[in-house]
Every structure is written in structure tokens, then in C-alpha cells.
């Protein structure tokens, strides 16, 4: 009988932590999908290049607010930055996600080499993600290079300057304490009634 109560106390104690962990993982995995896609590079003339980035997947819960794209070229190096602001479909008008994809593309007559980094700032969870990729080489065919963007490393970190910092941690801890107290009081009352 006592083992049954101990198992229920442990279950009630662990549940809020599991809910918190799964929600953070869900936010991270959906956001990271915005960094994967195809980068099309086309050298039109000697001094003119055309770069186009198409994300592989856009999570259904986001709408685009604004998009920026800049390209600079020096010799055979092309530097590009692609930034976009997204908001939740059913949220406020303010952006809830900022994604910045930047990179360096170096090309010659037969190949192109790409270094890419992607920064995602989720304003809802105050979590930022950095993805980096180095020296991916692709063949140049008729002055065109199609790059499939993948990453070597992923770093997640929680922003410390946000006014809502640790609100999810605080909520999970409060739920853990409350559920443990409720179950403990219930167990003690049951034990008193049975004795």
C-alpha cells in the first residue's frame, strides 16, 4: 500500500518537469527548422552575382512580418545576410521570432565553398539558438552552385537580459512544489483515517 503512494507522489512530482522539458524541446526543434534550406548562387557576369535562399520548412504557426536580404562581394568572396521576422498566427502583432542567416561563399571556376551561421532568437521563450557550418564544398556547374544548408554544431542558450527570464523555470518549480504538497497532505490524511 505504501509503495503505491510513493509511486503516485513521484509521478506527480516528475510530471511538471516533463511537461516543461517537452515544451522547450518542441519550441527549439520547430525553430531550428527555419535554418535549413537551399541556397542558390548564380554568377551572372564577372561582377554580378545572384543569391537566393529558400527555407526547407516554415512551421505552420508562424507568419512572416518582414524580410531583409543583403549581398556584398569582394573578389571571389560573397558575403550575405538573410534576416526575417515572424509572429505567431494567433498572437500579437509584435514579432515573436527573429532569424538571421549569414554566411560567406567563396567560389572559383569549378567549385564553391560555403560557411554559414544561423541565429534564432525566440522572444516567447527567451531562448537563442546558434547553428554553424564550415567549409562545405559544392561543384560549380555553368556558373551556378546549389547549396543544401546543413550544420556542424548547434548551441542553445537562455537569454539573461530578458524581463521574463526564468518564468518557465519558476512555473515548473511552483507546479512541482504544489503537486508534491497536495499528494503528501492527501497521503497523510489517508493514513490518519486508516489508523
Swiss-Prot record:
Residues 23-166 are extracellular. Keywords: Glycoprotein, Host membrane, Late protein, Membrane, Signal, Transmembrane, Transmembrane helix. Residues 188-195 are cytoplasmic. Residues 1-21 form the signal peptide. The chain crosses the membrane at residues 167-187. InterPro entries: Orthopox_A43R (IPR009487). Its main location: host cell. One of its GO terms (cellular component) is host cell membrane. Glycans are attached at residues 66, 115. It is a single-pass type I membrane protein. It is found in: Host membrane; Host cell surface. The keyword Nucleotide-binding does not apply. It holds the Pfam family Orthopox_A43R. Belongs to the orthopoxvirus OPG172 protein family. This is Protein A43. The lineage of its organism: Viruses, Varidnaviria, Bamfordvirae, Nucleocytoviricota, Pokkesviricetes. The gene is OPG172.
Amino acid at each position: 500500500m505504501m509503495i503505491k503512494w510513493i509511486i503516485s507522489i513521484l509521478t506527480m512530482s516528475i510530471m511538471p518537469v516533463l511537461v516543461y522539458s517537452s515544451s522547450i524541446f518542441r519550441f527549439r526543434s520547430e525553430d531550428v527548422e527555419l535554418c535549413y534550406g537551399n541556397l542558390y548562387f548564380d554568377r551572372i557576369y564577372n561582377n554580378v552575382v545572384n543569391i537566393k535562399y529558400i527555407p526547407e520548412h516554415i512551421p505552420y504557426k508562424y507568419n512572416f512580418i518582414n524580410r531583409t536580404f543583403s549581398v556584398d562581394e569582394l573578389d571571389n568572396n560573397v558575403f550575405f545576410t538573410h534576416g526575417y521576422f515572424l509572429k505567431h498566427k494567433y498572437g500579437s502583432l509584435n514579432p515573436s521570432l527573429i532569424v538571421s542567416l549569414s554566411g560567406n561563399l567563396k567560389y572559383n571556376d569549378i567549385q564553391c565553398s560555403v560557411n554559414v551561421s544561423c541565429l534564432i532568437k525566440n522572444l516567447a521563450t527567451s531562448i537563442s539558438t546558434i547553428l554553424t557550418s564550415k567549409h562545405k564544398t559544392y561543384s560549380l556547374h555553368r556558373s551556378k552552385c546549389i547549396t543544401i544548408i546543413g550544420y556542424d554544431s548547434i548551441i542553445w542558450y537562455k537569454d539573461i537580459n530578458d524581463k521574463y527570464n526564468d518564468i518557465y523555470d519558476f512555473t515548473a518549480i511552483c507546479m512541482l512544489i504544489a503537486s508534491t504538497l497536495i499528494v503528501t497532505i492527501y497521503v497523510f490524511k489517508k493514513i490518519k483515517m486508516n489508523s
